[in-house]
């Protein structure tokens, strides 16, 4: 549910859609906000200014993967996971959920909740193949990856791949050719390679240690590199890291010391630039004495031959969550859970500058966002 002040705008002829999941149950002690429905918002990133064009109530979660939304390449539907649900016995501590929902985007101004099915508990990252025929969901609490076939905007369970106890997959991502996928296991600190043959998904047996608390990943458009985050760092350094993996050999190409809590990693649509969302130890509540001292960070790197070189950075907000690029890589959007906003930045290849005209308020806490070109 959006803030009352937000007016839904008509959709332009060249809509560039982003789908954002918003969590209405994440409450903090002492705040005045109250429980509200989870929701999914549809934004037009091509509009000037960027605006919300539609919304629908649907299960969603802020605590969990920022890759909890996947949008079909033709922008006709989206899939949204919910890692948590409201806990009536203890409203300040939601419990694990297993929901996976399909959102119809045929009329973006009037999105519809078509279906909600179950994966495993703590349903986190979701990935959709480019053909839009198979979806994979990481079930963190179960240590498994669930597969669903997709036809006519409907999910049908197609089995699961068990990674094992103590793996806790937080994310999963398809390679561009759809024949492989990679599970990102938080507890194991590993990538697990999966083979995809139609609707049959199996482990290849190839694994790679990337770092502590491996969280999320994205693959370059040519399928060569996988870029992933490690909240607990790599090796002796416990600072959050970003690793680049060569998928030809499943070996580490480089490790970059990124900063505190790399929450989300995302590629520009041309695959040249890598943006990293850093929560950076910023406060989650305005009552925190550190509220005005520490904020989140955006860092943008150029990817060259498997290595990352920082080219720009900017301060962001508090409790930073998911992010998205626009189609031509000139705008970056950041979800701010504490402020309950989505904010925008302009990127020219060398600088990243806040555009205060792009500030969209939400009633629920934004938690995940994706476009058709996100992954």
Model regions: which residues?
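Predominantly soluble domains enriched in secretory-pathway, periplasmic, or organellar proteins
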Residues: 11-375
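Gram-negative bacterial Sec-dependent N-terminal signal peptides
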Residues: 1-13
């Amino acid at each position: 549910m959006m803030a009352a002040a937000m007016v839904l705008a008509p959709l332009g002829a060249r809509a560039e859609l982003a789908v954002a999941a918003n969590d209405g149950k994440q409450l903090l002690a002492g705040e005045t906000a109250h429980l509200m429905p989870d929701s999914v918002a549809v934004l037009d990133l091509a509009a000037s200014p960027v605006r919300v064009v539609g919304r629908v109530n649907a299960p969603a979660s802020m605590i969990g993967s920022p890759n909890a939304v996947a949008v079909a390449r033709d922008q006709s539907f989206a899939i949204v996971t919910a890692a948590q649900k409201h806990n009536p016995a203890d409203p300040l501590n939601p419990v694990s959920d297993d929901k996976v929902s399909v959102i119809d985007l045929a009329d973006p101004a009037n999105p519809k909740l078509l279906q909600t099915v179950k994966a495993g508990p703590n349903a986190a990252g979701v990935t959709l193949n480019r053909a839009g025929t198979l979806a994979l969901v990481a079930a963190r609490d179960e240590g498994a990856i669930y597969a669903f076939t997709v036809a006519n905007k409907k999910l049908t369970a197609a089995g699961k791949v068990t990674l094992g106890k103590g793996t806790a997959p937080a994310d999963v991502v398809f390679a561009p050719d759809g024949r492989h996928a990679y599970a990102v296991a938080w507890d194991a600190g590993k990538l697990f390679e999966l083979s995809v043959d139609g609707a049959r998904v199996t482990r290849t047996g190839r694994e790679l240690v990337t770092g502590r608390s491996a969280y999320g990943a994205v693959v370059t458009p040519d399928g060569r590199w996988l870029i992933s985050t490690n909240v607990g760092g790599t090796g002796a350094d416990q600072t959050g890291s970003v690793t680049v993996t060569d998928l030809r050999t499943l070996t580490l190409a480089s490790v970059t010391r990124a900063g505190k809590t790399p929450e989300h990693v995302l590629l520009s649509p041309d695959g040249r630039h890598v943006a990293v969302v850093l929560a950076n130890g910023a406060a989650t509540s305005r009552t925190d004495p550190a509220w005005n001292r520490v904020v989140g960070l955006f860092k943008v790197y150029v990817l060259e031959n498997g290595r990352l070189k920082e080219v720009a950075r900017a301060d962001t907000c508090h409790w930073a969550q998911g992010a998205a690029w626009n189609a031509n890589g000139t705008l970056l959007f950041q979800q701010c859970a504490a402020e309950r906003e989505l904010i925008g930045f302009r990127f020219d290849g060398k600088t990243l500058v806040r555009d205060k005209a792009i500030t969209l308020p939400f009633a629920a806490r934004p938690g995940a966002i994706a476009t058709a070109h996100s992954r």
